């Protein structure tokens, strides 16, 4: 079992990163928020979960153990696979997701692409007592100029399956709610807000 990968970032795609460690390139699937913090040529360490199936072995990477543990916990729920688990962590960071589950916030959970009302109710039913609300701080993610943030968020949304026009409109709506001159725009925050907005308008 591969619990973490520490090495040089050699490629970044919309849904994964390739990290070279000890001469081996590892493809690690990750959320858009995590990917937005990475840069080619830099050293990075990701906490990982490995999903082994008959025809594949897939790595999923996270910035901390809390997110990784929530990912594996989500996989224990009937009907939840890696794709939905990753989409959930793309919309909500670990503390926020824990809080939503602890509060039984079905409406918040249905904002995740792929989770309907019944699926959200199942998540609450099976995880409410298992997941404690917001145990600690969150990992600080990348920040940048508004134009850079916009392009990264739009690309991430398209990678999650949304149409380009939808992605652009949602991103612009979220950015318009903030100070347009803010050079400390949070990629992670804008992405989550855009996903929540798209979830409301599905």
Curated annotation (Swiss-Prot):
Q: Where in the cell is it found?
A: Cytoplasm
NCBIfam families noted in UniProt: ruvA (TIGR00084)
Q: Where is this region: Flexible linker?
A: 140-144
This protein is called: Holliday junction branch migration complex subunit RuvA
Annotated region Domain II: where? Answer: 64-140
Q: Which organism is it from?
A: Mycobacteroides abscessus (strain ATCC 19977 / DSM 44196 / CCUG 20993 / CIP 104536 / JCM 13569 / NCTC 13031 / TMC 1543 / L948)
Recorded GO CC terms: cytoplasm; Holliday junction helicase complex; Holliday junction resolvase complex
Its BP terms in the Gene Ontology are:
DNA recombination; DNA repair
The record ties this protein, via Pfam families, to: HHH_5 (PF14520), RuvA_C (PF07499), RuvA_N (PF01330)
Domain of life of the source: Bacteria
């Amino acid at each position: 079992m591969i619990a973490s990968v520490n090495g040089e970032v050699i490629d970044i795609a919309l849904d994964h990163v390739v990290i070279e460690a000890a001469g081996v390139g590892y493809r690690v699937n990750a959320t858009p928020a995590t990917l937005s913090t990475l840069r080619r040529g830099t050293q990075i360490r990701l906490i990982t979960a490995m999903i082994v199936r008959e025809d594949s072995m897939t790595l999923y990477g996270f910035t901390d153990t809390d997110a990784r543990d929530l990912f594996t916990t989500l996989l224990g729920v009937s009907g939840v696979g890696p794709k939905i688990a990753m989409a959930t962590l793309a919309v909500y960071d670990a503390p926020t997701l824990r809080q939503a589950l602890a509060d039984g916030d079905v409406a918040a959970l249905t904002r995740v692409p792929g989770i309907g009302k019944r699926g959200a109710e199942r998540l609450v039913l099976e995880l409410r007592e298992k997941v404690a609300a917001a145990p600690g701080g969150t990992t600080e993610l990348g920040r940048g100029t508004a134009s850079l943030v916009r392009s990264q968020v739009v690309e991430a949304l398209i990678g999650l399956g949304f149409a380009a026009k939808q992605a652009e409109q949602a991103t612009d709506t979220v950015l318009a709610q903030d100070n347009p001159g803010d050079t400390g725009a949070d990629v992670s925050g804008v992405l989550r807000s855009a996903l929540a907005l798209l979830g409301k308008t599905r």
